[in-house]
């Protein structure tokens, strides 16, 4: 094995000198043993500086590193465990278990740096993935193998929506999921793990964490670690869900690494390679003739500004965008999805069918009209509206409340038992509200229920 020596350490960036004839290539993994801490640290080559010196990014804490330490070239990129042995386990960026449950005992390891599938291998199927969440299935349906973005500021419910989706896919569809925590809070990661155990779906999920306190190299590469595990499940013929929370932190880690490597930043301080880095990740998240990877990516929107370069770059890769609104959350309506801002390429009569398309379009137009009437109501009151507009306001308020739904993973917060609603029941319920079948039922009956039958039952108790 070829070895070199550390010549410079600046935070998470380490320069290593090798002989000219054995210089490692970019993305090669290097290993260094830190005697004072009795631990091994993995470095990833980011640049060749010339003269046999390579600049590396540390995949862990650099405490104890010093000049002169021997570094071994592993002659391959970072490799992580793949396969069913990873299910139910919590791992770090290197695929090492961090859940105190012993070694993973994997049969195979894959490199985290892989090429996207060839164009000829891609699947063109347009199958819908029913989530059991009314507002998503009706207004912005998911496709198998699609990329979905959950956009929202801090505290509007991105992680809770993800937890519910994992629970529904595991329980109702018996599917595998890979959850990647990129730069999120350790507390959230712990809560998420415990929720998966409580929902009895832990054995269908592989969890990969690179938390906020980790060095930027970890946070930049952890998404690729999770994606590699998902690719293995896909290639075995499974329809797998890949959850990334949060794609914004992935961009941020790239910004930090870029600055550490001395690259010139672009707009708002982001790295000049933002589009390329995002493209490398997103192009690998795709479906082939063997199986599908459907990805749900939480996207933190800085200061609720959707034009920020990070969310704006993510937008271009997505098939569906779900915008979580602070105004809707303030009304106590959860999930706080904004049906007017959210959209999906799948909402097409040729894919979802004419009835579904018509109901979704009617719901949107009623809610849009209510939005326009709000100013008039605020100034002049309801009495000044025409009879037709009064009816629209009445129905839109019922629709708005019927879009709320009790989640299984949020039972402890809401006090309501979670419900999974079939697509047929969702379409039927909204269709009947639009037709005026329930104009006599007060709007309170539509809040936090599943199907329209539950509305009728709740109305009897009011």
UniProtKB/Swiss-Prot annotation:
The keyword Transmembrane helix does not apply. Keywords: ATP synthesis, ATP-binding, Cell inner membrane, Cell membrane, CF(1), Hydrogen ion transport, Ion transport, Membrane, Nucleotide-binding, Translocase, Transport. GO terms for cellular component: plasma membrane; proton-transporting ATP synthase complex. Its EC number is 7.1.2.2. It is found in: Cell inner membrane. It is a peripheral membrane protein. ATP binds at residues 152-159. It holds the Pfam family ATP-synt_ab_N. GO terms for molecular function: ATP binding; ATP hydrolysis activity; proton-transporting ATP synthase activity, rotational mechanism. It comes from the Bacteria. The keyword Nucleotide-binding applies. It catalyses: ATP + H2O + 4 H(+)(in) = ADP + phosphate + 5 H(+)(out). InterPro entries: AAA+_ATPase, ATP-synt_VA_C, ATP_synth_F1_bsu, ATPase_a/bsu_AS, ATPase_alpha/beta_chains, ATPase_F1/V1/A1_a/bsu_N, ATPase_F1/V1/A1_a/bsu_N_sf, ATPase_F1/V1/A1_a/bsu_nucl-bd. Coiled coil: none annotated. NCBIfam families: atpD. Belongs to the ATPase alpha/beta chains family. HAMAP family: ATP_synth_beta_bact. F-type ATPases have 2 components, CF(1) - the catalytic core - and CF(0) - the membrane proton channel. CF(1) has five subunits: alpha(3), beta(3), gamma(1), delta(1), epsilon(1). CF(0) has three main subunits: a(1), b(2) and c(9-12). The alpha and beta chains form an alternating ring which encloses part of the gamma chain. CF(1) is attached to CF(0) by a central stalk formed by the gamma and epsilon chains, while a peripheral stalk is formed by the delta and b chains. Produces ATP from ADP in the presence of a proton gradient across the membrane. The catalytic sites are hosted primarily by the beta subunits. This is ATP synthase subunit beta. The lineage of its organism: Bacteria, Pseudomonadati, Pseudomonadota, Gammaproteobacteria, Enterobacterales.
């Amino acid at each position: 094995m070829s070895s070199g020596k550390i010549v410079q350490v600046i935070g998470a960036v380490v320069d290593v000198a090798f002989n000219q004839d054995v210089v490692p290539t970019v993305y090669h993994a290097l290993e260094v043993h830190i005697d004072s801490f009795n631990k091994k640290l993995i470095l990833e080559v980011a640049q060749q500086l010339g003269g046999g010196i390579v600049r590396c990014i540390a995949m862990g804490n650099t405490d104890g590193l010093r000049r002169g330490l021997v570094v071994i070239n592993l002659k391959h990129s970072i490799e992580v465990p793949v396969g069913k042995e990873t299910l139910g386990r919590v791992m770090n960026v290197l695929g090492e278990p961090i859940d105190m449950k012993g070694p993973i005992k994997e049969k195979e390891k894959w490199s985290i740096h892989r090429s996207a599938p060839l164009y000829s291998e891609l699947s063109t199927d347009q199958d819908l993935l029913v989530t059991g969440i009314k507002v998503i299935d009706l207004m912005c349906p998911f496709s198998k193998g699609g990329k979905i973005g959950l956009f929202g500021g801090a505290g509007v419910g991105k992680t809770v929506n993800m937890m519910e989706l994992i629970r529904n896919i595991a329980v109702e569809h018996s599917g595998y999921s890979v959850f990647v925590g990129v730069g999120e809070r350790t507390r959230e990661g712990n809560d998420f793990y415990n929720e998966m155990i409580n929902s009895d779906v832990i054995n269908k999920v592989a969890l990969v964490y690179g938390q906020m306190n980790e060095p930027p190299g970890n946070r930049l590469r952890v998404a690729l670690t999770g994606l590699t595990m998902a690719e293995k499940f896909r290639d075995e013929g499974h329809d797998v869900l890949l959850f990334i929370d949060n794609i914004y932190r992935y961009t941020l880690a790239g910004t930090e690494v870029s600055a550490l490597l001395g690259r010139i930043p672009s707009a708002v301080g982001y790295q000049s390679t933002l589009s390329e880095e995002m493209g490398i990740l997103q192009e690998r998240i795709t479906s082939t003739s063997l199986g599908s990877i459907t990805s749900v990516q939480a996207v933190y929107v800085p200061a609720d500004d959707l034009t920020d370069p990070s969310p704006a770059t993510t937008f271009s890769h997505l098939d569906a965008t779900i915008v979580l609104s602070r105004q809707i959350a303030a009304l106590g309506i959860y999930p706080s999805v904004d049906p007017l801002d959210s959209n999906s390429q799948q909402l097409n009569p040729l894919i979802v069918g004419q009835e579904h398309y018509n109901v979704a379009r009617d719901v949107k137009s009623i809610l849009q009209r209510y939005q326009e009437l709000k100013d008039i109501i605020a100034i002049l009151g309801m009495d000044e509206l025409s009879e037709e507009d009064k009816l629209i306001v009445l129905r839109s308020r019922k629709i708005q409340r019927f879009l709320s739904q009790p989640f299984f993973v949020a039972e402890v917060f809401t006090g309501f038992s979670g419900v999974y609603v079939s697509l047929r029941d969702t379409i039927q319920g909204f269709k009947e509200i639009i037709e005026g079948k329930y104009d006599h039922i007060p709007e309170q009956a539509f809040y936090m229920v599943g199907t329209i039958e539950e509305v009728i039952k709740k109305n009897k108790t009011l």
